[in-house]
């Protein structure tokens, strides 16, 4: 006898011939011979049963008629060294039986099989099973598979077996794999129709209402399983008062704009979530110190330097929907660099900067509306400046800090509306060259230079401004001081990356609001020799947004699933 497997094979031969068997497992009219010692060694259930008062030592039978005979037989064969023959049809029965009998190795083998074979064809079935038997490992994996394949599953025959509680969980999840929030109501309606269950307010609350198109909101209003419920109509009548929703993880693309370390090109990179890497999707001739603004998923780059010693008045753009460059855009009124860029729903604004002729600071704010033939002067700042932070919030253009006359930083904060300029609470410290983002109704700034007099080294400061209370709050500092970093908001989180810190940095950081701390983010590491200049979350757009509302709009929406 050379090893344990040979010994087990011999004992199995004894079992098959009935030698030394001291227990019979009875399931209805079927009997399975076995040895107590073998069963006790593999099964916690049998170990307790045979070593306690549950069964008399002289009893020769154990009745397990409440279990599936074939599963028990397969598991006893497994105890005697015969491998489990698992299929999608039998694995659930074997797993639940192994769980009852507490055969740990068989449970692990079944779980591995299910996890390996999970797909869109069986994930709902396994999710319902795991929920019933409280198997958290399989439940989590199958739920994530449902999220990834949700738009395939809305026509699956098992879709109707999901409970309302499960649908609330699915529709609430940030990782729901839809590239436009309009698909979430489609998922809800398909489930309501398959179950013929009336809608509830709890289900409607799972939708990111503020992100829905008017056509889809009308479709919800008019659907019989929604419109027949008074509470649902009341909820929809009050959606104007709901807080702004954050887009789901898959409904935006992260697009970064940067320049190569070798100073030979502008690079447009897209974040690949599956690989956790940034991938270059396009590039063009080098330019730096330009302003960036995004309107209708088109990234505009204004002014700056190219490889000549002169500042540029040219404006170029990158269309993220068509992955193409746009060059036929009217030039700025005059060449400038180190300016700020923002956009509202109609216009792109180019703010301040440095003039080409005499390197003097600029106070003018020019704007351009796509399809118009030229830029117009919109307003002038109270003080000429460059390298300031700019943000658009609640219809106001905020100008934050910057470099003013004498090459010094300023702590001024002002906003521009149709009624003119308004002063606000000054920055806690004079700053310039910081990154700026609007997030959750506040303005956040990070990095740059900060100094009470002349401009000097990089900063790791992070501040937030609350426009309601007109106050600044100092947050936890960055791990790495950065000049002109990219600051972006995605999935209700803040990120900072790139910029210059003594040398160019490829690192990024994530902000934990609850702990008030920044952590280095290994998931958004930038390519080598790449200076991230700006990062913009781009919301996916679909041709359906141009389609007029009809009674069968949701059916029309369904046709865009694979687009």
Curated annotation (Swiss-Prot):
Keywords: Host cytoplasm, Host-virus interaction, Kelch repeat, Modulation of host E3 ubiquitin ligases by virus, Modulation of host ubiquitin pathway by virus, Repeat, Ubl conjugation pathway
GO BP terms, alphabetized: symbiont-mediated perturbation of host ubiquitin-like protein modification
Residues annotated as signal peptide: none
InterPro entries reported in the protein's UniProt record: BACK, BTB/POZ_dom, Kelch-typ_b-propeller, Kelch_1, SKP1/BTB/POZ_sf, Vaccinia_A55R
Domain (BACK): residue spans on this chain: 123-219
Subcellular location: Host cytoplasm
Keyword Signal: no
Residue ranges of domain BTB in the record: 21-88
Disulphide connectivity of cysteines: none
Kelch repeats: 252-297, 298-346, 347-395, 397-441, 442-492, 494-538
Gene3D superfamilies: 1.25.40.420, Kelch-type beta propeller (2.120.10.80), Potassium Channel Kv1.1, Chain A (3.30.710.10)
Domain characteristics, as noted in the entry: The BTB domain is responsible for the interaction with CUL3 while the Kelch repeat domains supposely serve to recruit the cellular substrates.
Protein function: Probable substrate-specific adapter of CUL3-containing E3 ubiquitin-protein ligases which mediate the ubiquitination and subsequent proteasomal degradation of host target proteins.
PANTHER family given in the database record: KELCH-LIKE PROTEIN 32, LD33804P
Subunit structure: Interacts (via BTB domain) with host CUL3.
Protein name, entry field: Kelch repeat and BTB domain-containing protein 1
Organism: Cowpox virus (strain Brighton Red)
Upper classification of the organism: Viruses, Varidnaviria, Bamfordvirae, Nucleocytoviricota, Pokkesviricetes
Gene: KBTB1
């Amino acid at each position: 006898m050379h090893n344990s497997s040979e010994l087990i094979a011999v004992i199995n031969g004894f079992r098959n011939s009935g030698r030394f068997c001291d227990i019979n497992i009875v399931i209805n009219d079927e009997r399975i011979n076995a040895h107590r010692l073998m069963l006790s060694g593999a099964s916690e259930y049998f170990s307790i049963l045979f070593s306690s008062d549950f069964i008399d030592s002289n009893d020769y039978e154990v009745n397990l008629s409440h279990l599936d005979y074939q599963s028990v037989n397969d598991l006893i064969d497994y105890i005697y060294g015969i491998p489990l023959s698992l299929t999608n049809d039998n694995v659930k029965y074997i797993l639940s039986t192994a769980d009852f009998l507490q055969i740990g190795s068989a449970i692990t083998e079944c779980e591995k099989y299910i996890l390996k074979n999970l797909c869109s064809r069986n994930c709902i079935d396994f999710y319902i099973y795991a929920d019933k038997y409280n198997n958290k490992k399989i439940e989590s994996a199958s739920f994530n598979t449902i999220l990834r394949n949700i738009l395939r599953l809305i026509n699956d025959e098992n879709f109707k077996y999901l409970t309302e509680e499960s649908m609330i969980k699915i529709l609430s999840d940030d990782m729901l794999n839809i590239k436009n929030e309009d698909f979430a109501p489609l998922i809800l309606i398909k489930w309501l129709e398959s179950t013929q269950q009336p809608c509830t307010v709890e289900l409607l609350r799972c939708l990111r209402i503020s992100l829905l198109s008017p056509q889809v909101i009308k479709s919800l209003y008019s659907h019989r399983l929604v419109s027949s419920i008074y509470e649902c109509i009341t909820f929809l009548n009050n959606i104007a008062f709901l807080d702004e929703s954050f887009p789901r993880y898959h409904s935006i693309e992260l697009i970064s704009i940067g320049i190569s370390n070798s100073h030979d090109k502008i690079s447009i990179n897209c974040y690949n979530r599956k690989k956790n890497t940034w991938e270059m999707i396009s590039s063009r001739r080098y330019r730096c110190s330009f302003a960036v603004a995004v309107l209708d998923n088109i990234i505009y780059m204004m002014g700056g330097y190219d490889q000549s010693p002169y500042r540029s008045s040219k404006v170029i753009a990158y269309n993220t929907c068509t992955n193409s460059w746009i060059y036929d855009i009217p030039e700025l009124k005059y060449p400038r660099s180190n300016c700020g860029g923002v956009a509202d729903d109609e216009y792109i604004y180019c703010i301040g900067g440095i003039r080409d002729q005499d390197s003097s600071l600029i106070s003018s704010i020019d704007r351009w509306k796509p399809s118009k033939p030229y830029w117009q002067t919109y307003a002038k700042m109270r003080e000429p400046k460059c390298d300031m932070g700019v943000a658009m919030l609640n219809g106001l253009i905020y100008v934050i800090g910057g470099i003013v006359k004498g090459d010094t930083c300023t702590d001024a904060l002002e906003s521009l509306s149709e009624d003119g300029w308004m002063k606000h609470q000054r920055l806690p410290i004079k700053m310039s060259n910081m990154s700026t983002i609007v997030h959750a109704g506040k303005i956040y700034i990070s990095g740059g230079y900060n100094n009470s007099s002349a401009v000097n080294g990089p900063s790791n400061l992070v501040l937030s401004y609350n426009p309601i209370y007109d106050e600044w709050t100092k947050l936890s500092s960055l791990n790495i001081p950065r000049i002109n970093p990219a600051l972006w908001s995605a999935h209700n989180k803040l990120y900072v990356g790139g910029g210059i810190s003594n040398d160019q940095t490829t690192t990024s950081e994530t902000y934990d609001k609850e702990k008030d701390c920044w952590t280095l983010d290994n998931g958004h590491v930038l390519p080598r020799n790449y200076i991230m200049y700006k990062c913009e979350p781009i919301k996916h757009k679909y041709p359906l947004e141009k389609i007029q509302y009809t009674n069968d709009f949701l059916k029309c929406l369904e046709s865009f699933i694979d687009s």
